[in-house]
UniProtKB/Swiss-Prot annotation:
Record: residues binding K(+): 226, 245, 247, 250
Binding site for (6S)-5-formyl-5,6,7,8-tetrahydrofolate: 24, 81, 120, 455
GO molecular function: GTP binding; GTPase activity; metal ion binding
PROSITE patterns: G_TRME
Family affiliation: Belongs to the TRAFAC class TrmE-Era-EngA-EngB-Septin-like GTPase superfamily. TrmE GTPase family.
Binding site for GTP: 226-231, 245-251, 270-273, 335-338, 359-361
UniProt: Mg(2+) binding residues: 230, 251
Name this protein carries in UniProt: tRNA modification GTPase MnmE
EC number, UniProt record: 3.6.-.-
Annotated compartments: Cytoplasm
Length: 455
């Protein structure tokens, strides 16, 4: 535990007027401030109703005073909460009184930062506080709460413990060469390594789902000109976000629209029609479309169900196959069902490809697409599964997986225990970045500075 020398204060409730406003104080002067403001000694962990006093003994407000001596508090330090009326003037006067008594204004996220530094929370849990506050759907809020309760951290710690056990075995064999352990023939190391890689892959998959729920899924609408891409964007957005005409090539640039489906955020990107063209401006639009396809979380490949080439849509644009994400992230949209003989519906092939037949113009089948996109974001997770994750967590997991893959290759092809030991160390370090065990100070500063003041 790190002892803080400064006492900090901030308004913990949202800006503006409200029924209740909270001023939070943390640090060694919290107890003295409690006596000065409330005019009496406060019993620990009890709510005391009474006046809040200024320096002259005049009443600023009336409300509840709660004192939590450290280390049994949110920050691990002495903490005081003053819960009064939610008027900004009253709250500012309370903060000013605390400043007069020796506290200083807290930085954004400093309360959570102190909780982290005092081992009350790890870094993933601290970030989950902000995620819970900013959650835009019930599922995102549930996931953030599970991360705050330590679910994500437990998964990471379990992987770390397995890596430590594996490192002990490998490094002991290196330190005692007289034992002459053949890592490859032994089978024990390879078995443990495969187990860790499998479990890491599972955590990566669940973390990716959690990140989509938190940050929103980027959905790129792609296809040939006049397939109805812009009409589909307008239908999803519920407004005329894109110009729609019968002229092929109307959309020449990337158009972005941010929407919510049952509170779940989606970043929908309409792109230029994919075709060979001599038009310089349209050619740039096609290049940008292909780039957007490569960066998408999900691609909606839109085809005109009335066109002859719709029978084999993936042959419409060969470069699409090179730029698109993995096959499971592509949904085929057979549009203009109102002009064809096809029935509205959703089909899933044996290889996992999903095809949705709809009409963007009439809206028929649009609800199927919405439900499909919600499922892609993890909307169907139960309350007992899933956790919140951020992009930096995904990157740390990716790098850990990369290190394990390299170590596995070294073991299989070279039987190189020394190189495997280094890869295991790197994988452990990358996992430690998630919980804060191995995190540079500048990164910590960036993370906590993004929090609300008073959190």
């Amino acid at each position: 535990m790190q002892a803080a020398t400064e006492t900090i204060v901030a308004i913990a409730t949202a800006q503006g007027r409200g029924g209740v406003g909270i001023v939070r104080i943390s640090g060694p002067l919290a107890g003295q401030i409690a006596v000065a403001v409330s005019g009496r000694q406060l019993k620990a962990r009890h709510a005391h109703y009474g006046p809040f006093l200024d320096a002259g003994g005049q009443v600023i407000d009336e409300g509840l005073s709660l004192y939590f001596p450290g280390p049994n508090s949110f920050t691990g330090e002495d903490v005081l909460e003053l819960q009064g009326h939610g008027g900004p003037v009253v709250l500012d006067l309370l903060v000013q009184r605390c400043l007069e008594l020796g506290a200083r204004q807290a930085r954004p996220g400093e309360f959570s930062e102190r909780a982290f530094l005092n081992d009350k929370l790890d870094l993933a849990q601290a970030e989950a506080i902000a995620d819970l506050i900013e959650a835009s759907s019930e599922q995102a809020a549930r996931n953030a709460l599970r991360s705050l309760q330590g679910e994500f951290s437990r998964r990471v710690h379990a992987l770390t413990e397995q890596l430590i056990s594996l490192r002990i075995y490998v490094e002991a064999a290196i330190d005692f060469p007289e034992e002459e352990i053949d890592f490859l023939a032994d089978g024990h190391v390879l078995g443990l390594l495969e187990k860790v890689r499998t479990e890491l892959s599972t955590v990566q998959r669940e973390a990716s789902q959690g990140a989509l729920l938190r940050d929103g899924m980027t959905v790129v609408i792609a296809g040939r000109p006049n397939a109805g891409k812009s009409s589909l964007l307008n239908a999803l957005a519920g407004r005329e976000a894109a110009i729609v005409t019968d002229i092929a090539g109307t959309t020449r640039d990337v158009l972005r629209e941010h929407i919510h489906i049952d509170g779940m955020p989606l970043h929908v990107v309409d792109t230029a029609g994919l075709r060979d063209t001599e038009d310089h401006v349209e050619k740039i639009g096609v290049e940008r479309a292909l780039k957007a396809i490569g960066e998408a979380d999900r691609v909606l490949l839109v085809v005109d169900a009335t066109a002859p080439e719709a029978a084999d849509p993936f042959s419409l644009w060969p470069e699409f196959l090179d730029q698109r994400p993995e096959p499971g992230k592509v949904t085929l949209i057979r549009n203009k069902a109102d002009l064809s003989t096809e029935s509205i519906g959703l089909e899933e092939s044996a290889d996992g490809h999903v095809t949705i037949t709809l009409s963007a113009r009439t809206g028929a089948g649009l609800e199927l697409l919405r439900e499909h996109l919600k499922a892609c974001m993890g909307f169907e997770q139960t309350a007992e599964s899933g956790f919140s994750a951020r992009r930096r967590h995904l990157e740390a997991l990716r790098q850990a997986g990369q290190a394990l893959e390299h170590g596995h290759s070294q073991l299989i092809h070279n039987g190189a225990g020394e190189l495997l030991a280094e890869d295991l160390r790197q994988a452990q370090q990358h996992l430690g970045e998630i919980t804060g065990a191995f995190t540079p100070d500048d990164l910590l500063g960036r993370i906590f500075s993004s929090f609300c003041i008073g959190k």
